[in-house]
Amino acid sequence: MNLEFYRGKRVFVTGHTGFKGSWLCRMLVGAGAVVTGYSLEPPTTPNLFSLAGLEGKMTSVIGDIRDFAALKAAFDAAQPEIVLHLAAQPIVRDSYKDPRYTYETNVMGTVNLLECVRTAQTPPRSVLNVTTDKVYQNNEWCWGYRENEPLDGFDPYSNSKSCSELVTHSYKNSFFADGSVAISTARAGNVIGGGDFANDRIIPDCVRAMAKGESIGVRNPYSTRPYQHVLEPLAAYLLIAQCQYEDNRYAGYYNVGPDDCDCVTTGTLVDLFCQAWGDGAAWENRAEANAPHEANFLKLDCSKLKSTFGWKPRWHMAECMQKTVAFSKVWLSGGNIPAEMDKEIKEFLSE
């Protein structure tokens, strides 16, 4: 895969200061795209956006996706050809603490963005709304969910993303049925990779424990998730956005996840982390009594993405973990993060 298509393209990215957004902007900037990002301040300290060397290479607008006037001003100034919507409140456990904020951000934020598209003097040709694997009604099935399964997330985060999907479907059918704007959603699994500093995510928890010389505490070691390296879904997003830009018949709804062999339990994932880290890394089960509900078994069927675009995952879980650990050790040693990002992106795209 190469990103030559994006050279000179005007791309508007919401949520650009987050973990996935920072990696995405590094990919786009490296491809020569004209990137405008709209997002809150980076959500953690430290954060990947500040480490990624993007200052001066893109337009970064700090704003709240709930603020329609500010969002529209940034959107209209950018005059984007392609829109990638990643802005979200992304943490399940945080959604239990503040459900209203979660719904306002994830549902009305999507409405605000699509209103910008609808009312633009020159609308973009390609729009992709990034949701989550958790949009589906989870029946704890042993097989992967397909794109035609019912959308009914349980917790406020998952449910707000189900709502974001429905909002997107409505706007697509109501205002863009003529295909003038190609609109898709991408439902991606759990991502791992270097540069994630969020709370309540397993790999950041692992890295923090290693930095302190502690054992890793794992809340849900037996839960199964479609883990994948962060570059996997980002490459899929860029592929979908490009293909529907060139031919609006590709607009649709796509799962993005790993092969079945890489849908592992969290305990297995942490085992792989410890093996890659070395130095006696170990973990322990710290299951919490009366913890908020989280799905136990979740897999995606990505046949549609594979058959439509010839897409396939590049890195299996052991290699994902090796890349993640290598990045984390570069960061802990004060190394060159932009160079490490570019190295991983180049290796990924060359496979």
Task: Label every PLM stretch briefly.
Residues M1-A188, F348:
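N-terminal Rossmann-like NAD(P)+-binding domain of SDR-like oxidoreductases, especially those catalyzing
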Residues P43-T44, Y136, I192, D262, ...:
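Flexible, glycine-rich phosphate/dinucleotide-binding loops
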Residues Y6, H16-G18, V83, Y171, ...:
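Generic structural signal for small/hydrophobic residues in well-ordered secondary structure
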Residues N139-G144, N148, P156-Y157, S162-Y245, ...:
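NAD(P)-dependent short-chain dehydrogenase/reductase
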